[in-house]
Amino acid sequence: MYIVMITPECAPIAKVGGLGDVVQGLSNELSIRGNTVELILPKYDCMRYERIWGLEKTHNNLWVPYHDQWIPCDVYFGFAEGLKCFFIEPHNGFFQRGTYYGQPDDPQRFAFFCKAALEFMLRSNKYPEIIHCHDWQTGLVPVLLFEQYKYLGMTHPRVCYTLHNMRHQGVTGGHILQQVGLDPAAYMTPERLLDHTYPHGVNLMKGGIVFSNFITTVSPRYLDEIRYTDQGYGLQHTLHEHSQKLGGILNGVDYKVWNPDIDPYIAARYNLKTLDKKYENKTALRHRLWLRDEYKPIVGVISRLDPQKGVELIRHALFYCLANGCQFVLLGASASNSINADFWYLKQYLNDDPDCHLEIGYDEDLAHQIYAGADMLIVPSIYEPCGLTQMIAMKYGTVPIVRHVGGLADTVFDANYAHKPYHERNGFVFHDFNHEGIEAALHRAIGLWYEYPQYFRELMENGMRYDFSWNHPGQHYLNIYHHIQEI
């Protein structure tokens, strides 16, 4: 099958969050299964070009109709982690901003990218069976495909559209439709792209939902949450109207990258049969971070310091752990200056504490070493479409402590959860987003570590037995692709 991913991100070359990991992991899995997979991305000036092999310009005469003019573009080709990638570089500087997102004209930038991606496919005679789009940034692709490019000969492709985070929907003014050649009066209706909140607004994510052949979310639980709770951020009715083409598929983890048995970044490699070597990594982590060697559990956090990720509870857990016989390690940073400043203050305040280390930023080596050396990992999110950290932690025998939301609820089952056999229980879960909730979960986890280490080890082993690879999600997506081909 010939599949084209149109995406704003792909790890490791252009990654802001989990979306980039998903695109890379799923594309690799589909390629391994014998499919032809190509990716189309913007050519950001801030990409990690050192991770792109064989980058060369392949087209320098792609003219894209946009806003009553023709914008010239160059197209480059290269390999990223073995994946075939095309990068579109418009001459108007849309993607020469030193950042991926966060610009006032982001809707215009990515509306243009949607148009340019389809124009490139048309002009280069690419007719895939499946176009797979991701989040609001590519929401206009199915709209333009079925309302414009179908009549130019692109009648074959079917579109799968994945919702990674409903919090960001690409809401903008109606003028954007005119800029890409669509009549605002025809598309700014409640059944099409009209936003639910702003009476004169266009919702790009809604366009993707309405016009795609199938929509997926990144976990089954998140699908329920966005349909039936305020996590749909106003699109609940639209999702209900299109419920016949909705499905939730749990993301996978790339075990070529996140696997303690082959991990080049950790002090001692190990697997389920050699789990005792994990403690060598605990010692190495302490030495790297200048933590004292004591008989204490290490509680880790690897996270964006974003309100969604539960920074308030992370901060509270830090002091609770230090007061209750634990060491605490954090790796993370925030796009918010105030949150960063808060954690920098905490870092300075706790600088002389031999049981605590806060690393403000992101360090790939250290992330691997925390997964390998920590005993527990906290993920106290307000909402979590899927979450990868808890699944990675389990592969490393690190017991997750999570809030019961989204993909966390689909992957972590409490040590006391009576509806699961004991060998399927793999962590600690709390429900209420408050201090009492996370304290109760930490109290149980810390108590088990100290008082019943043999039972704690069973949780570690249970987690390591779970298969969160891309094998099952890859097959689910192929089933969807085959299904929508018949439409």
UniProtKB/Swiss-Prot annotation:
<keyword id="KW-0808">Transferase</keyword>
<dbReference type="InterPro" id="IPR013534">
    <property type="entry name" value="Starch_synth_cat_dom"/>
</dbReference>
<comment type="function">
    <text>Synthesizes alpha-1,4-glucan chains using ADP-glucose.</text>
</comment>
<dbReference type="GO" id="GO:0004373">
    <property type="term" value="F:alpha-1,4-glucan glucosyltransferase (UDP-glucose donor) activity"/>
</dbReference>
<comment type="similarity">
    <text>Belongs to the glycosyltransferase 1 family. Bacterial/plant glycogen synthase subfamily.</text>
</comment>
<dbReference type="InterPro" id="IPR011835">
    <property type="entry name" value="GS/SS"/>
</dbReference>
<comment type="pathway">
    <text>Glycan biosynthesis; glycogen biosynthesis.</text>
</comment>
<dbReference type="Pfam" id="PF00534">
    <property type="entry name" value="Glycos_transf_1"/>
</dbReference>
<feature type="binding site">
    <location>
        <position position="15"/>
    </location>
    <ligand>
        <name>ADP-alpha-D-glucose</name>
    </ligand>
</feature>
<dbReference type="GO" id="GO:0009011">
    <property type="term" value="F:alpha-1,4-glucan glucosyltransferase (ADP-glucose donor) activity"/>
</dbReference>
<keyword id="KW-0328">Glycosyltransferase</keyword>
<dbReference type="InterPro" id="IPR001296">
    <property type="entry name" value="Glyco_trans_1"/>
</dbReference>
<dbReference type="Pfam" id="PF08323">
    <property type="entry name" value="Glyco_transf_5"/>
</dbReference>
<dbReference type="GO" id="GO:0005978">
    <property type="term" value="P:glycogen biosynthetic process"/>
</dbReference>
<keyword id="KW-0320">Glycogen biosynthesis</keyword>
<protein>
    <recommendedName>
        <fullName>Glycogen synthase 1</fullName>
        <ecNumber>2.4.1.21</ecNumber>
    </recommendedName>
</protein>
